[in-house]
Amino acid sequence: MESDGKSDRTKVPTAASSLNEKKADLNDQPGHSTDTEGNGSDNNNTQVGEKHHVSADDGPVDTAPVELAATQHQHPVEAEQNYPSGLKLTIILLALELAVLCVALDNTIVATAIPEITNQFHALTDVGWYGSAYLLTLCAFQLFFGRLYQLFSIKWVFLSCLFIFEIGSLICGVAPNSTALIVGRAVAGLGAAGIFSGALIIIAFSTPLEKRAIFTALISAIFGISSVIGPLLGGVFTDRVTWRWCFYINLPIGGVTAVALVFFLNIPPREAQPDTNETLRQKIMHFDPIGTAIFLPCIVCILLALQWGGTTYAWSDGRVVALLVLFGVLLITFVGLQFWMGEDATVPVRIVRQRSVGSAAVFTGLVGASFFIMVYYLPIWFQAIRGATATQSGINTLPMMISTTVGNIVGGVFVSFTGYYTPMMYALPPMASVGVGLMTTWTVDVSTGKWIGYQILFGLGLGLGMQQGIVTAQASLPVADTAIGTSLQVFAQMFGGSLFVSVAQNLFSNEVIKGLAAVDELGMTPQAVFNAGATELDNLFGSNPSLLAEVKVVYNDAVIWTFRTALITTCLSVLAVIFVKSGSVKGKKIEMVAA
């Protein structure tokens, strides 16, 4: 290259000369343009994979970024990453599974302890809040923690969430009254909001993309299994020790998890963290505090409206109407704010507008709805129709949970070996919808073979594609957005579950009340029968077999309506899959240090 008065910039060591030659070669190719003379062009700053502007004054430089820029334009590129392996990886995975175990257990373990809790605190009217307080904060803060994971140390954000969760569990364990228990549940939910998504984010930074699906499946399988064994464990603690151990159990498990991660988890520092020279106000604005303040009551309003409407209050009641109107106003405000905040939004709009990511979130939400509806209402069917205890009903749902776990693992292995994640997403709707569709044919005297077989078909289909939305997000987004993309998928799953469980609860309670009102010689009000609980039917009507049979038919029909809701959400999930771009994780590398 000849001197033109800028020889001080062009006479550089060999590596820089090689870099300029490579850029010149790229200029000769259609669609490529580079600027080596610093004439105002910004190309050097925008090349995929580069971290800073390259000039001759920088001395020897690595030519790899330019080579990669010529071959990859859609996805960042992964430098060689020293992922943990062997015993270290095993310990990290076990620690994450223990953390997820606590979160999932806490979601359902309280169910069988509620009767004893209400007896001790004399607070039957607070029953709904024992579960709702946990779910409300878990859903509402899910996206907020996604933002924290993007901006700060993943390891310490996760450990902070675990600490908050443990504090909440401790408050619940020592609660002297119902109000303290509800506060503890809300605090535990706040910590739980960052644990499940955080575990998946840590997996993303600890394993190569092509193997990530199988590890994600293992984490998700633990969540599903724990959700079912929760009531079993809660019943054992309540009967044999005290209900307070439903919460104390989280303390030693969380302690082991924290120690393991402190010593074995090491994620490189990321360049996406806030500038230390920023003012306090600038740092705070990175968290979108206004958006969070709007989003929290928005979620609370819709979940409360669905829980109260048609049961506690009529749909026309002013309180329910006000909640729905307020939800709509807050949602519109939140969405508008996300556009206005740009990159400082809780969820930058460009991420949601990425077709595969947005569609995967809808898919994950609908599948989460199907899963949680069945987790909650299958035990009710066994308790009301078959007279099973809480423990027995949990055992009877094992065919679904085991097959879901197997499906999760099979789906993860398939993606790891083939690289393609969309086939498993397409496999879910037909298999799962046939399974749950057959379950809507259940009658009071359905055979054991049918209720086992139909559960297996539904669970296997659900498991195959249940977590592929998370894989889709991680494969479709640059690693700097992995935390938010993962949190978005987890939020969709949790919120979809919470939303449609409330819808199913409305259908169930209304159908029971309506059906019981048509039963002759009931001897008590339909509401009184409903409030007594599904496990009390044999005690209430056991002396009159024909009346008991009639009441069980009413409960069977009501539960079937919840199964139909799961059938609808399962079928609708195929519409979301259509918009997910087919892709492979094979050979798709991600630059981990840039996150």
Curated annotation (Swiss-Prot):
It comes from the Eukaryota. Keywords: Cell membrane, Glycoprotein, Membrane, Transmembrane, Transmembrane helix, Transport, Virulence. Residues 1-11 have a biased composition (Basic and acidic residues). GO terms for cellular component: plasma membrane. Residues 1-62 are annotated as: Disordered. It is a multi-pass membrane protein. SUPFAM superfamilies: MFS general substrate transporter. The chain crosses the membrane at residues 91-111, 126-146, 156-176, 186-206, 217-237, 245-265, 290-310, 320-340, 362-382, 409-429, 451-471, 483-503, 559-579. GO terms for molecular function: transmembrane transporter activity. InterPro entries: MFS, MFS_dom, MFS_trans_sf. It is found in: Cell membrane. Pfam families: MFS_1. Glycans are attached at residues 39, 44, 177, 277. Residues 30-48 have a biased composition (Polar residues). MFS-type transporter; part of the gene cluster that mediates the biosynthesis of the phomopsins, a group of hexapeptide mycotoxins which infects lupins and causes lupinosis disease in livestock. PhomT is likely to be involved in the cellular export of phomopsins. Belongs to the major facilitator superfamily. TCR/Tet family. This is MFS-type transporter phomT.
